[in-house]
């Protein structure tokens, strides 16, 4: 039960659980039965190095290494992580933080899609799955959306609820909500 060394991917074990293996065939995530792997989207129970590397590459340009980690949030048992895979490679990630505000229980953070995989609907698929989860919980979602991501969030039904503002070292954002 392994993959070729150097390839990240998924296999099923004898109990029908999905295992995500890293490049050395070490099991890094045990997921519920395969029904949780859908359209290349996988709920993760924690962030791993690939997740942090993608966050850093896409979201933390010019900032020091380590800024891609969200202390206290990444370790919070209530935090959910949704990742997108294509060909066994992590190409998109998001963090769904429990951070209640005005009718929204959840906040999207760390939403990133690999530059080589943009404009393929991966970000929208991630957001729609997060919305499905929030809807099942009877709540909405809020986020601080980068200017370049606002059109995607609007297509997914989010609305701007603030004027544009700057997060130092990161760039211009809008506060957005989906209820």
Could you tell me what each predicted segment is?
Residues 5, 55, 153, 158:
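Conserved active-site tyrosine of GNAT-family acetyltransferases
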Residues 13-14, 23:
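Short hydrophobic alpha-helical segments enriched in small aliphatic residues
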Residues 21-87:
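Short amphipathic alpha-helix that is part of the acyltransferase structural core
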Residues 76-78, 102, 167-172:
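Short acidic/glycine-enriched loop/turn segments that link adjacent beta-strands
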Residues 83, 89-99, 105-112:
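Conserved beta-strand in the GNAT
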Residues 113, 119-132:
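Conserved acetyl-CoA-binding loop-helix of GNAT-fold acetyltransferases
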Residues 134-146:
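Conserved GNAT acetyl-CoA-binding A-motif
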């Amino acid at each position: 039960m392994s993959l070729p060394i150097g390839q990240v991917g998924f296999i099923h074990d004898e109990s029908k659980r999905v295992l995500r293996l890293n490049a050395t065939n070490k099991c890094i995530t045990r997921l519920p039965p395969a029904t949780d792997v859908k359209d290349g989207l996988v709920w993760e129970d924690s962030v791993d190095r690939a997740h942090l590397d993608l966050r850093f590459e896409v979201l933390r340009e010019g900032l020091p290494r380590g800024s891609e980690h969200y202390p206290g949030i990444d370790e919070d048992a209530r935090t959910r992580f949704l990742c997108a895979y294509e060909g066994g490679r992590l190409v998109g990630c998001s963090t769904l933080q429990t951070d209640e505000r005005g009718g929204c229980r959840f906040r999207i953070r760390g939403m990133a899609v690999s530059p080589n995989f943009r404009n393929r609907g991966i970000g929208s698929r991630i957001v729609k799955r997060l919305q499905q989860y929030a809807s099942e919980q009877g709540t909405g979602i809020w986020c601080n959306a980068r200017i370049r991501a606002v059109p995607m969030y609007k297509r997914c039904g989010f609305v701007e609820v603030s004027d544009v503002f700057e997060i130092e070292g990161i760039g211009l954002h809008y506060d957005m909500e989906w209820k």
